[in-house]
Amino acid sequence: MNKNLKVLALKYRPKIFKDLIGQEIIAKTIYNSIKHDRSANAYLFTGIRGVGKTTIARIVAKSLNCLKGIDNLCSEDLCENCNAISNSNHIDVLEMDAASKTGVDDVRDLIEFSRYGPTSSKYKIFIIDEVHMLSKQAFNALLKLSLIHISEPTRPR
């Protein structure tokens, strides 16, 4: 089978802010906050299935960690960081599907992962898909994680 074959939704998934359709306001707002080094500690994207919440989260992760900078963001994943983020194998970007990992132990793994600074990029980023599916205990542990980092934010190297 040909390794170049991809599902159309993945093949044409937006890779940079200007490729987003129907999300212009949020894309411009987040783009400007990153460009002016005023990004938030966390972003929460809501909406119905298929509107691009995870896609925007990946674009934000790329924008924060692209080796070329936000103005020259890799639309074809040319830099090492953007390529790794697109392939879900970047060491500093952890993507978790909370629909299948709903337990407190899964969130404790996130807490353990967050104890150390980024190793190959500016920021360590967590993308938690379907966060509403976490158990009450897991959500409380996640809240504890966010409180730790809000009170003691880590700045990039």
Model-derived segments and spans:
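Walker A/P-loop
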Residues: 2-6, 35-36, 40-88
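Pre-Walker A (pre-P-loop) alpha-helix and adjacent loop at the N terminus of AAA/AAA+ ATPase modules
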Residues: 3-48, 111-120
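Conserved RecA-like P-loop NTPase ATPase core
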Residues: 20, 30, 45, 54-57, ...
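Helical "lid/switch" subdomain of P-loop NTPase nucleotide-binding domains
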Residues: 26, 103-106, 130, 134, ...
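Short glycine-rich substrate-engagement loop in P-loop NTPases that contacts/grips substrate
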Residues: 91, 98-123
